[in-house]
């Protein structure tokens, strides 16, 4: 399993094998001639670095020009003006009465479009902090390097019409995400940060704090990752004393699926889900996994994800996620004995895991983004527990607010105290600037 995963990784990233893109856009007209496109939204909208648009992936059905129309297949990146996307969001100033367009996954949109040339599209793509799913081609282009990764065609939506939902489940998800935004809006900046942690939506996250997370080497906390799933697994594990280990494992799987459905299947979330799924299957087969077994789970997840989700292979989130876990499994055991000589065992284990992940991801971070944050070695050890407590307390608070809405403002004080502690810690470590290579 490990040899197969290593060979596959070398073949993919050395460009010896170029996987076919199942989502490559195809239609019978030149891209420059396209004036209209219709299809279903297949990703969460995320604000671009310019702040003028929201970027999303559209699974195209039809395309047309002024004098003809044809069927289309594959995906495009659609840039929708902020005022249209934010029309339904709480606290925003825009209002499009009777013309509201819910821009969420599963919505069918009919748009008149204008193509954006690749040379001018870099400033209109999603920021890496908004989920960490920046493609390797975009990242390397931003660093001045060339990439042969095929680019998704980019279009600006000049007019957009909502034409229904793909199914009732997509509609339920969109309404649930909108309702969560309205609940968390009452908690101010604390609610904005919690919204980013729960759903991957960064519309209400304090921009200075988001930048501080990056400067402090903590961008992985804002990105949906395995850390979030591990918290759900830990919560479900407490039920094993009531229902048994196997039932608790099933509950963990249900909670993970529900979270991925609500937040969206980012590459790092899929990686974490596959690793846990393999581990749960092993548990049902009464197979005890050691650290070597955990590495086998990671290799199995890598093979499955590259086989079925080609679009993830060259994303920064995919590469950094696997590199981080590989570093924890392979490097941290060599660091742990040294740290145990002067640190308590629990702290040494946490520090060695952080060091392993940092050492494994630093070369990739330098190549993809042009900088590294050495302070992340220390900040992750201190801030990650604070973020976990804030995340768990926020989820519990939202649960009670949904049942008893009058508790919304009563719980606000607790959330604000936890947010202040987390914010202070992040801003402190952000004073140590990252090292730039550009």
Segments from the language model and where they lie:
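N-terminal leader/targeting segments
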Residues: 1-28, 127-132, 139-142, 154, ...
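Internal transmembrane alpha-helical bundles of multi-pass membrane proteins
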Residues: 265-438
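Structural detector for short beta-strands of small beta-barrel domains
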Residues: 32-49, 56-58
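OB-fold/S1-family single-stranded nucleic acid-binding modules
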Residues: 55-61, 116-168
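Aromatic-rich juxtamembrane segments at the membrane interface
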Residues: 148-275, 280, 284
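Short nucleic-acid-contacting surface segments enriched for D/E, G, S/T with interspersed K/R
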Residues: 85-111
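OB-fold (S1/OB) nucleic-acid-binding surfaces
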Residues: 49-80
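Residue-level "contact hotspot" at macromolecular interaction interfaces
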Residues: 28-30, 35, 87, 101-102
């Amino acid at each position: 399993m490990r040899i197969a995963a290593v060979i596959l990784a070398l073949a993919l990233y050395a460009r010896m094998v170029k996987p076919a893109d199942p989502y490559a856009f195809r239609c019978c007209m030149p891209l420059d001639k396209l004036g209209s496109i219709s299809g279903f939204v297949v990703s969460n909208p995320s604000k671009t670095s310019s702040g003028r648009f929201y970027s999303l992936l559209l699974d195209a059905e039809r395309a047309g020009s002024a004098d003809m129309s044809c069927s289309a297949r594959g995906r495009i990146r659609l840039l929708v003006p902020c005022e249209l996307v934010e029309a339904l969001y709480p606290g925003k100033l825009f209002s499009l009465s009777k013309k509201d367009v819910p821009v969420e996954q599963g919505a069918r949109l009919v748009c008149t479009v204008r193509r954006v040339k690749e040379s001018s599209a870099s400033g209109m793509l999603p920021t890496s902090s908004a989920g960490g799913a920046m493609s390797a081609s975009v990242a390397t282009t931003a660093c001045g390097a060339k990439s042969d990764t095929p680019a998704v065609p980019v279009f600006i939506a000049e007019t957009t019409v909502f034409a229904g939902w793909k199914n009732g489940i997509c509609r339920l998800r969109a309404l649930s995400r909108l309702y969560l935004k309205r609940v968390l809006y009452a908690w101010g900046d604390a609610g904005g940060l919690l919204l980013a942690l729960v759903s991957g939506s960064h519309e209400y996250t304090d921009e200075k704090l988001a930048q501080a997370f990056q400067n402090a080497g903590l961008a992985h906390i804002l990105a949906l990752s395995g850390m979030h799933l591990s918290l759900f697994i830990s919560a479900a594990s407490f039920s094993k004393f009531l229902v048994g280990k196997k039932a608790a494992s099933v509950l963990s799987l249900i909670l993970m699926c529900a979270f991925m459905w609500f937040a969206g299947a980012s590459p790092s979330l899929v990686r974490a889900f596959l690793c846990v799924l393999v581990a749960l299957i092993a548990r049902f087969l009464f197979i005890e996994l050691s650290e070597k077994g955990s590495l086998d789970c990671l290799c199995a997840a890598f093979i499955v994800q590259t086989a079925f989700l080609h679009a993830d292979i060259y994303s920064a989130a995919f590469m950094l996620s696997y590199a981080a876990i590989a570093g924890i499994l392979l490097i941290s055991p060599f660091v742990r004995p040294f740290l145990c000589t002067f640190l308590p065992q629990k702290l040494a284990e946490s520090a060695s895991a952080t060091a392993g992940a940092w050492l494994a991801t630093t070369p990739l971070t330098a190549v993809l983004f042009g900088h590294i944050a050495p302070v992340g070695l220390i900040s992750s050890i201190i801030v990650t527990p604070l973020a976990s407590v804030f995340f768990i307390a926020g989820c519990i608070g939202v649960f009670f607010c949904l049942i008893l809405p009058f508790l919304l403002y009563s719980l606000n004080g607790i959330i604000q105290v936890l947010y202040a502690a987390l914010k202070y810690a992040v801003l402190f470590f952000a004073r140590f600037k990252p090292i730039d290579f550009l």
